Amino acid sequence: QIETNKKCQGGSCASVCRKVIGVAAGKCINGRCVCYP
């Protein structure tokens, strides 16, 4: 998993993870987006 510094209040991490790892797979943990390659 790849932790990002993107906050994810009231939103999904799909667009963030798509930019970071090329796959829209991730979830919000402790207010931050965590992506799963």
Swiss-Prot record:
Keywords: Disulfide bond, Ion channel impairing toxin, Neurotoxin, Potassium channel impairing toxin, Pyrrolidone carboxylic acid, Secreted, Toxin, Voltage-gated potassium channel impairing toxin
Residues of the site described as Basic residue of the functional dyad: K27
A UniProt-annotated Pfam family: Toxin_2
Residues marked Aromatic residue of the functional dyad (site): Y36
Tissue spec: Expressed by the venom gland.
GO cellular component: extracellular region
Site-annotated residues for Hot spot basic residue in hERG blocking currents: R18, K19
Localization per Swiss-Prot or TrEMBL: Secreted
UniProt keyword Oxidoreductase present: no
Principal location class: secreted
UniProt-listed InterPro entries: Scorpion_toxin-like_sf, Scorpion_toxinS_K_inh
Sites bearing Pyrrolidone carboxylic acid, chain numbering: Q1
Note on domains (UniProt): Has the structural arrangement of an alpha-helix connected to a beta-sheet by disulfide bonds (CSalpha/beta).
Protein name (Swiss-Prot/TrEMBL): Potassium channel toxin alpha-KTx 15.3
Organism: Androctonus mauritanicus mauritanicus
Organism ancestry: Eukaryota, Metazoa, Ecdysozoa, Arthropoda, Chelicerata
